């Protein structure tokens, strides 16, 4: 667990009791942005199921807690289900918009990458709905490089969305 006493931010493993807070953060992005391709809000029960599924795969799901409130999260999930992909993971980070600019994404990814080094993960992949300069910068800060852009693979809010993929190995 990482702490920053100056800002009272703790990075820790998510628990079932965090599901409502995680869903609230995520549902902002569902309703207001194209960074997720979900189009309907998800319930806290569905979010709890997602967290449990990731953790059952022995992968990290972390939350950033500031003053006892979950204000962001990051996790690594299996990249694909077929056996030969078993050493590849996809990483994701979401922040409460009220906490942008506080380097929480960096703190979460620092801890996420540290956690991943103790797993069997080899390839780390990040998918980014484009354009998204902040997310691109965060992923590149962690040594990831662009390997692909899939054009017009998503359609949300009456427009086509490209998705770029960034990758690195551990």
Per-range role (PLM):
Residues 101-114, 137-141:
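Conserved acetyl-CoA-binding loop-helix of GNAT-fold acetyltransferases
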